[in-house]
Design a protein with these regions (language model features):
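Cleavable N-terminal signal peptides
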Residues: 2, 13-14
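A contiguous strand-loop segment
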Residues: 16-116, 136-290
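Short, well-ordered beta-strand elements within core beta-sheets of diverse protein domains
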Residues: 120-126
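Accessory, solvent-exposed terminal regions and/or long lumenal/extracellular loops of proteins
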Residues: 258-341, 345-347, 437-439, 448-449, ...
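Substrate-recognition/cap regions that form aromatic- and gly/pro-loop-enriched pockets
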Residues: 322-458
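Histidine-centered catalytic/metal-binding microenvironments
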Residues: 441-501
Length: 501
């Protein structure tokens, strides 16, 4: 029988996975940040926020991304950058996973203005570097209040990738406490609904940034009595539980282990939830530099061949059925005859609304510096289309014009239809139908064929994008506006061609 700590599984709103690659760990010298947005209420579509100039006194509306509630306004800046999904026109990328944390530090219901969704998109509209993004996220939450629970953010530009972990001050005060750690060159990071920052260097601004009161706030409100040097962010703000380890850190373990040559094998009992004192490193070195296709495979992972493999091939698991499927319907845990049982939580999962793998490349002009390889639905079975941070249009099948959950998201452009209505003009619904073929007893026969074809198309689109980038650079030197239109048309055509297949 599992302990009651299991029931404190994954706090917060969306149960997402991030994998973060420093430029020294990537095959082409780009930074790579990946994200699966996992929630049964998410219907994947791609947001576009065009660059704009704003008159003095302009205000920006703030919305709670999860609850679709209007939370207030903040002053707008004179100019906002182009934002496509989670990348902007100068190569900044932001991802997130919710860890929840202490209930008394939940930012909801305390008059705060900025939830994690609008914190991401407001920051992307203003930030030119990862460090500036972290400063903006700090400033916005201190000034206007952080209306969320605990979040882990991946924040990157073409030079650096940071893991920023942020907690609201909840009922005690307006603002946030946070620590940001730069991923060393040649290393990768990962997060999955459990805070990962423990103790941290407090005199190394090249590699670690933090809220000025991250320790003092805990002294004043949460009973911390230790030294500054011994302060443990996770222990104070999101204590590890069986559920946090088994459903969160287990995904980090399965993302780390293949790329670091088994370097976290010694932490298996931690990922199992059996030894919560055997914590994994925050970042690990790679044994081979990673390509985008390598990261595709990381984000497709179902813990195959590991102790956590739910397919039933290596050990009995009735949930795998005759097709040895790793997919499980909710809930993660259930009770039977007085005992609590669990399903494993894998990185690739059927309830993703969308997923992306984004690169930032400092050698390219700003409009194509960041490319967002975007896929609606399950990261395992969905091809990813290229969308650049400077694009000014979205392929028709991937935008809000083809459906969103009623009232869902930030209503910049209300959709004429809702996401609950099946729509064969929507990439989400087509990708979802294909993915469903691989579930249950059909998995062992259908899944290999689906991913083989996805990989063929992904390889083709990667090659197409490299050629487009060469052509863009040549055109950019002559006519910048024409180059942006050329790139935007490429994104539209590539997305719609993939949709029609």
């Amino acid at each position: 029988m599992l302990g009651l700590a299991l029931l404190a599984v994954v706090g917060g709103a969306r149960a997402c996975s991030n994998f973060l690659v420093s430029k020294g760990a990537s095959a082409d010298g780009s930074t790579i940040l990946s994200y699966t947005a996992d929630d049964l209420s998410l219907f994947g579509s791609l947001d576009l926020r065009l660059a704009a100039d704003h008159a003095p006194g302009s205000l920006r509306n703030m919305w709670d991304w999860d609850d679709q509630l209007f939370t207030g306004t903040i002053p707008e800046v004179p100019h906002t950058l182009n934002v496509v999904g989670n990348v902007n026109e100068v190569g900044v990328i932001i991802t997130e996973t919710t860890f929840g944390g202490r209930s008394d530090l939940d930012g909801h219901g305390h008059g705060n203005n900025i939830s994690y969704g609008d914190l991401i998109w407001t920051t992307l509209s203003r930030a030119h570097t990862a460090r500036e993004a972290i400063q903006i996220m700090d400033s916005l939450t201190q000034l206007y209040g952080y209306e969320s629970s605990g979040e882990s953010y991946g924040v990157g530009d073409s030079d650096e990738v940071w893991l920023l972990e942020m907690m609201s001050k909840g009922k005690y005060a307006r603002g946030s406490v946070w620590v940001a750690s730069r991923i060393p060159e040649g290393y990768v990071g990962a997060t999955a609904n459990q805070a990962r920052t423990t103790t941290f260097a407090q005199n190394d601004p090249d590699n670690v940034l933090f809220a000025k009161d991250v320790v003092q706030f805990a002294r004043d409100n949460l009973g911390y009595t230790g030294t500054d040097a011994d302060f443990n962010f996770r222990e104070m703000y999101d204590p590890i539980t069986f559920g946090g380890a088994r459903f969160g850190e287990q995904r980090v373990w399965t993302m780390f282990n293949p790329v670091c040559g088994g370097c976290v094998d010694a932490h298996l009992d931690f990922a199992q939830g059996y030894n919560l004192n055997n914590s994994m490193p925050l970042f690990v070195p790679v044994v081979k530099k990673l390509s985008v296709m390598d990261v595709v495979h990381v984000m497709r992972d179902h813990a195959e061949g590991t102790w956590f493999d739910p397919s039933g091939l290596d050990r009995p698991d009735v949930g795998g059925e005759s097709g040895h499927s790793p997919y499980r319907v909710r809930p993660l845990t259930w009770d039977f005859n007085g005992s609590t049982y669990l399903n494993e939580r894998t990185v690739g999962i059927q309830q993703s609304g969308w997923a992306f793998i984004a690169q930032s490349r400092g050698w390219l002009p700003p409009p194509i510096r960041a490319v967002n390889w975007f896929a609606p639905d399950d990261a395992s079975t969905s091809p990813r289309i290229p969308m650049y941070g400077g694009a000014t249009r979205i392929p028709a099948a991937f935008g809000h014009t083809v459906g969103q959950v009623p009232g869902g998201g930030v209503p910049y452009a209300p959709s004429p239809v809702d996401g609950f209505t099946m729509n064969l003009q929507s990439a989400f619904w087509i990708w979802n139908l294909v993915g469903n073929v691989a579930f249950s007893e059909r998995y062992s026969t259908a899944y290999p064929d689906i991913v083989a074809q996805v990989d063929v198309e992904q390889t083709r689109m990667l090659a197409d994008s490299l050629q487009m980038e060469k052509d863009f650079v040549a055109l950019w030197a002559v006519d910048e506006a024409a180059a942006v239109e050329f790139m935007t048309k490429f994104c539209e055509d590539e997305g719609m061609d993939m949709f029609k297949k």
